[in-house]
């Protein structure tokens, strides 16, 4: 097996949360920008397909992101290091809740999640030498009842923007959560157990 030199990877994501999680386990990484400029369209269409299950959805998006990152790496003539990608979605009663499109959409999501259990699916993928390995983390999150005033105040904080399900477990939304069953880091956006497995399989040791 060809192993990467220097125990360094590329992260195909702009997410500060995923960067922080990689730093937490001591993984050196560089950011691989998937767009040359913000005005250009994204490489990955994140629209769910008809009848696509939540697991299949995050697997597909992650696989596409990871392989697109590897291709971009080769096109730019950058060092051929592993490319890590991930995708997170929130699922309520089988319905995929992506990132809110606007304030009204965020309010609708939070009202729906109030007092309910939902699932958070995060897939992580690592592409190296043209081979992509995938793992999936599934976590159940239980919200307490959230008042309309709290929803409005939370939206005003700006935290729901660009978050799957319109909330961030590592932020103020932690006050809404009664308990979780599964991976905290998976809900944040990068399940560290599954990520470390992929890294080990590719020849990168966390320890």
Curated annotation (Swiss-Prot):
Q: Which UniProt keywords apply?
A: Cytoplasm, Hydrolase, Nucleotide metabolism
> Which CDD domains does this entry report, sorted A to Z?
Maf
Q: Where is the active site?
A: 87 (proton acceptor)
EC main group: hydrolase
- Entry GO CC: cytoplasm
Entry's EC annotation: 3.6.1.9
Q: Which Pfam families match?
A: Maf (PF02545)
Molecular function as annotated in GO? dTTP diphosphatase activity; UTP diphosphatase activity
Per the database entry, which stretches of residues form a coiled coil?
none
Which cofactors go with this protein? a divalent metal cation
Q: Which GO terms describe its biological process?
A: nucleotide metabolic process
Q: Which SUPFAM superfamilies match?
A: ITPase-like
Catalytic reaction(s) noted? dTTP + H2O = dTMP + diphosphate + H(+); UTP + H2O = UMP + diphosphate + H(+)
Q: Which domain of life is it from?
A: Bacteria
Name the site position(s) for Important for substrate specificity: 17, 88, 170
Q: What Gene3D superfamilies has UniProt attached to this entry?
A: 3.90.950.10
Localization annotation: Cytoplasm
Its principal location?
cytoplasm
The record's function comment reads:
Nucleoside triphosphate pyrophosphatase that hydrolyzes dTTP and UTP. May have a dual role in cell division arrest and in preventing the incorporation of modified nucleotides into cellular nucleic acids.
Identify its protein family: Belongs to the Maf family. YhdE subfamily.
The name this protein carries in UniProt is dTTP/UTP pyrophosphatase
User: Highest lineage ranks of the organism?
Assistant: Bacteria, Pseudomonadati, Pseudomonadota, Betaproteobacteria, Nitrosomonadales
């Amino acid at each position: 097996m060809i192993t990467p030199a220097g125990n360094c990877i590329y992260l195909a994501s702009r997410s500060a949360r995923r960067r922080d999680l990689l730093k937490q386990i001591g993984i050196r990484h560089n950011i691989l920008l998937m767009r040359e400029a913000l005005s250009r369209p994204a490489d990955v269409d994140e629209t769910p397909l008809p009848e696509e299950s939540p697991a299949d959805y995050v697997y597909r998006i992650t696989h596409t992101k990871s392989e697109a990152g590897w291709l971009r790496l080769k096109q730019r003539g950058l060092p051929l290091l592993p490319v890590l990608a991930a995708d997170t979605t929130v699922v309520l009663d089988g319905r995929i809740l992506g990132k809110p499109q606007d304030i009204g959409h965020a309010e609708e999501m939070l009202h729906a999640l109030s007092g309910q259990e939902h699932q958070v699916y995060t897939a992580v993928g690592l592409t190296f030498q043209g081979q992509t390995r995938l793992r999936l983390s599934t976590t159940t999150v239980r919200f307490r009842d959230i008042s309309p005033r709290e929803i409005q105040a939370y939206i005003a904080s700006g935290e729901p923007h660009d978050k799957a399900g319109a909330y961030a477990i590592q932020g103020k939304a932690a006050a809404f959560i009664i308990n979780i069953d599964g991976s905290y880091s998976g809900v944040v956006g990068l399940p560290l157990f599954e990520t470390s497995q992929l890294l080990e399989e590719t020849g990168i040791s966390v320890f």
